[in-house]
């Protein structure tokens, strides 16, 4: 999730 949109699992 780090650095990515909160809606994505990563």
From Swiss-Prot:
Which GO biological process annotations does it have? oxidative phosphorylation
The pathway entry for this protein reads as: Energy metabolism; oxidative phosphorylation
Q: Where in the cell is it found?
A: Mitochondrion inner membrane
**Keyword annotations from UniProtKB, A to Z:** Membrane, Mitochondrion, Mitochondrion inner membrane
Cellular-component GO terms for this entry: mitochondrial inner membrane
Tissue-wise expression: Liver and heart specific isoform.
Describe the subunit structure: Component of the cytochrome c oxidase (complex IV, CIV), a multisubunit enzyme composed of 14 subunits. The complex is composed of a catalytic core of 3 subunits MT-CO1, MT-CO2 and MT-CO3, encoded in the mitochondrial DNA, and 11 supernumerary subunits COX4I, COX5A, COX5B, COX6A, COX6B, COX6C, COX7A, COX7B, COX7C, COX8 and NDUFA4, which are encoded in the nuclear genome.
> What's its job?
Component of the cytochrome c oxidase, the last enzyme in the mitochondrial electron transport chain which drives oxidative phosphorylation. The respiratory chain contains 3 multisubunit complexes succinate dehydrogenase (complex II, CII), ubiquinol-cytochrome c oxidoreductase (cytochrome b-c1 complex, complex III, CIII) and cytochrome c oxidase (complex IV, CIV), that cooperate to transfer electrons derived from NADH and succinate to molecular oxygen, creating an electrochemical gradient over the inner membrane that drives transmembrane transport and the ATP synthase.
* Family named by the database record: Belongs to the cytochrome c oxidase VIII family.
Q: What is this protein called?
A: Cytochrome c oxidase subunit 8B, mitochondrial
Question: What species is this protein from?
Answer: Oryctolagus cuniculus
What gene does the UniProt entry assign to this protein? COX8B
């Amino acid at each position: 999730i780090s650095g990515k949109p909160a809606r994505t699992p990563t």
